[in-house]
């Protein structure tokens, strides 16, 4: 049934991190910090990130050690690389305001393939860490999205309506629909959805209006 502003009850909102709450650039833009060619295939930053994402390394220190081994860069350069790539995303103030507004009415869960310490550092810097009731991250689970384990971790104990928001329909939201979540896709020019999501938004800032508008989101 549609969610109407007049009868809207608290929901369980599962939010992706990159592409929804924050925007990361292409990490290859900072290849010079490591002294590597950004055109290298595979780019050496990727296996280091994937190792963290998949739980093979468990801390920033271990990531830095691996990145240094892969690139030959100093630990100092690798720490600078982390600062520039993962700890300094674009985080519009409007997004922080949206998070605070949503958290005042709904339960918020952040669900990401990003490393927990990096997410927590950024959320704390912008004063929104307390907006989230839980962080579900693939390094802790050792299973990146779209493995179903993380989706089940995000589900509430009760029967609240569950909505997932992501800019990646094919990788994230199809599995969300499979486990009964309503999908809200942040439109992404780099992706063509396999099928129509339950709702579309242009930016994260549009989410409150969609949740509160008759017919905006047909909850599963």
Question: PLM features: what roles do these ranges have?
Answer:
Residues 49-82:
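A metal-dependent, Asp-based hydrolase signature
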Residues 9, 80-108, 148:
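Short, acidic loop-to-helix structural element flanking the phosphoryl-transfer center
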Residues 20, 88-89, 144:
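Transmembrane alpha-helical core positions of polytopic small-molecule transporters
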Residues 1-15, 109-111, 115-116, 120-220:
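Asp-based, Mg2+/Mn2+-dependent phosphohydrolase catalytic module
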Residues 30-33, 39-54, 81-93:
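Helical cap/lid subdomains and adjacent loops of hydrolase enzymes that gate the active-site channel
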Residues 2-47, 70:
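Active-site neighborhood of HAD-like aspartate-dependent phosphohydrolases
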Residues 7, 28-37, 98-105, 152-158:
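Alpha-helix C-terminal capping segments
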Residues 27-31, 60-68, 116:
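An amphipathic alpha-helix signature
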């Amino acid at each position: 049934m549609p969610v109407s502003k007049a009868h809207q009850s608290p929901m369980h909102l599962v939010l992706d991190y990159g592409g929804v709450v924050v925007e990361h650039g292409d990490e290859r833009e900072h290849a010079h910090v490591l002294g590597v060619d950004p055109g290298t295939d595979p780019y050496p930053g990727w296996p280091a990130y994937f190792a963290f994402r998949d739980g093979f390394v468990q801390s920033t220190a271990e990531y830095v050690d691996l990145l240094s081994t892969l690139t030959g860069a100093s630990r100092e350069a690798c720490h600078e690389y982390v600062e520039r790539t993962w700890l300094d995303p674009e985080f519009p103030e409007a997004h922080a305001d949206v998070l605070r507004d949503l958290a005042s009415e709904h339960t918020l869960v952040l669900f990401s393939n990003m490393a927990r310490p990096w997410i927590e550092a950024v959320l704390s810097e912008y004063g929104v860490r307390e907006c989230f009731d839980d962080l579900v991250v693939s390094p802790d689970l050792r299973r990146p999205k779209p493995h179903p384990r993380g989706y089940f971790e995000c589900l509430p104990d009760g029967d609240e309506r569950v909505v997932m928001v992501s800019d990646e329909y094919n990788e994230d939201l199809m599995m969300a629909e499979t486990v009964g979540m309503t999908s809200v896709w942040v439109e992404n020019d780099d992706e063509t959805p396999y099928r129509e999501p339950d709702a579309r938004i242009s930016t994260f800032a549009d989410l409150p209006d969609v949740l509160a508008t008759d017919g905006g989101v047909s909850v599963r």
